[in-house]
Amino acid sequence: MSAKETIEKLKKARIITALVTPFKENGQINFEAFPKLVEDLLASHTEGLILAGTTAESPTLTHDEELEIFASINQLVDGRVPLIAGIGTNDTRDSVEFIKEVAKLGYIDAGLAVTPYYNKPSQEGIYQHFKAIATASDLPIILYNIPGRVVTEILPDTILRLAQLENVIAVKECTSTDNLAYLIENVPEDFLVYTGEDGLAFHAKTLGGQGVISVASHILGQEFFEMFAEIDQGSIQKAATIQRKILPKINALFSVTSPAPIKTVLNNKGYAVGGLRLPLVACTDQEAKIIIEQIEN
């Protein structure tokens, strides 16, 4: 799929859910848990899915497992919403080879490429890393800027430089409202700016951004949909009321390292998403109690 075709599809995708990976008690992927979860997400206004991203515990998934997830979700979704595959690592060569493999599948709309972690590259190294991935195949990529997890930040001017590449079509920006505003003001016309911070979904949309790539939309998709509808209609105060209502719930979902809280909530709601793979661990009983109380409040 060409960059232009994917951009047109993503223009309809304001709420993209970063999908969790369900696990069985033995640590294997629970593919049987996907159908109910995915169908309920689509019914509650998820307009795109991130597969094998941070929320999916991608650092502990093998590429073979990721490919199995892609195939499973593609069969379930059947073209109803865009599918974005996590393809990035801190190894440029590995990322290039994997995006080539993913591009051959034919049903993935874009790749999500995270800033190289641990290596601490310079801005030039970051640029060259993403350029190598973007030019390795026809599959367009979304930049994933999340310095809170990877330490290194893609500075706004580096994002603007990368945005000039035909196959770099969007950014998942997990920094500040200042950076969101600067990017939205200065990126090329068809370059899409998403926030990756659930608590900044209101801010990103009111600033003119595309929307949110979200963890909280596993359970708050309807609320995000209603908030964005109010913003689109110019009813900022009504949208702000929704933002104030959901913010404590969003904060609860990040009170412990994600995705432990969202998995706690989903398990409590009857979705068999199971536990986490080490080195991540499940919420303690006390943490889970507080999180569930806040969500149900």
Swiss-Prot record:
Its main location: cytoplasm. Pathway: Amino-acid biosynthesis; L-lysine biosynthesis via DAP pathway; (S)-tetrahydrodipicolinate from L-aspartate: step 3/4. Keywords: Amino-acid biosynthesis, Cytoplasm, Diaminopimelate biosynthesis, Lyase, Lysine biosynthesis, Schiff base. Gene3D superfamilies: Aldolase class I (3.20.20.70). It is found in: Cytoplasm. Its EC number is 4.3.3.7. InterPro entries: Aldolase_TIM, DapA, DapA-like, Schiff_base-form_aldolases_AS. SMART domains: DHDPS. This is 4-hydroxy-tetrahydrodipicolinate synthase. It comes from Lactococcus lactis subsp. cremoris (strain MG1363). The gene is dapA.
